[in-house]
A protein has these predicted regions:
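Membrane-anchoring hydrophobic helices of lipid-metabolizing enzymes
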Residues: 1-88, 98-102, 127, 132
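Soluble catalytic domains of membrane acyltransferases
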Residues: 70-234
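Short, cationic low-complexity segments
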Residues: 237-238
Length: 238
């Protein structure tokens, strides 16, 4: 007897693929100005980062991804092509909790940082912890932009991976790739760094309405030096 696909748990309609937001989180973002420290020079910061990231976040990521998302990762071998080189990773934004976790498992054992909305460092308690987990909030003014870009350069030069969600807004369980601006690709162009695509897909499970995630890695992709800088970003995006 042929089984039918389960009905959708929720149907959502959109009008603007770039700006519609379906996350339920309501957070008042703090202002990220020139006083924000993207790189903390204090000697205890690295130790705190190790404890928060390796001893807390990674086990939490493993448990959540395996038990809640039933996650599987494909094509991780492509990471070998870049060795110890720092890279950018571009992903589709479809999980409010899973998206901070999935890249850390997919890219393990690399040290991962993420370019995030200021909301992610504005939460009363967790917002104090997220910088130790790798959050790099977008600056709120031009003066803060220099520190932001310097931090990105530093992390790439030390061999870390920086995750970018260019779609910006969360569309839970969305199965397509949304339109996003080519300016999102300016980081690998300016730093002449390789980049990867991280695509999370959703697959039906036999005895559950909640799907399994399968995340694919593709790349590395490099800026085309035969093109002018703006065209390089467009070519990487396409």
């Amino acid at each position: 007897m042929k089984t039918q696909a389960p009905p959708p748990i929720k149907t959502v309609y959109y009008t603007d693929a770039r700006n519609d937001e379906f996350s339920s989180a309501q957070i008042e973002p703090r202002r990220i100005d020139e006083s924000y420290r993207y790189i903390d020079p204090r000697p205890g910061w690295k130790a705190a980062r190790f404890v928060a990231y390796r001893l807390f976040a990674m086990p939490a990521a493993f448990l959540y991804c395996k038990l809640a998302l039933h996650a599987r990762f494909e094509n991780r071998q492509v990471l070998k092509a870049v060795g110890k080189t720092g890279c950018f990773v571009y992903g589709n934004h479809t999980q409010q909790v899973g998206d901070p976790f999935l890249p850390n498992l997919a890219l393990f054992p690399k040290s991962v940082y993420m370019i995030v909305h200021p909301n992610n460092v504005s939460m009363p308690v967790l917002g104090k912890l997220t910088p130790y987990l790798g959050a790099l909030p977008l600056p709120s003014n031009i003066k803060a932009m220099r520190s932001f870009l310097d931090a990105i350069r530093t992390r790439i030069e030390e061999g870390s991976f920086i995750v970018v969600y260019p779609e910006a807004h969360i569309w839970p369980y969305y199965t397509g790739i949304r339109d996003f601006p080519a300016t999102s690709m300016k980081y690998p162009v300016e730093l002449d760094a390789p980049s990867f695509a991280l695509t999370t897909t959703y697959h039906r499970r036999r005895f559950s309405r909640k799907p399994r995630t399968v995340t694919y890695l593709d790349g590395p992709f490099y800026p085309d030096h035969s093109l002018p800088p703006r065209a390089r970003a467009q070519a990487l995006r396409d």
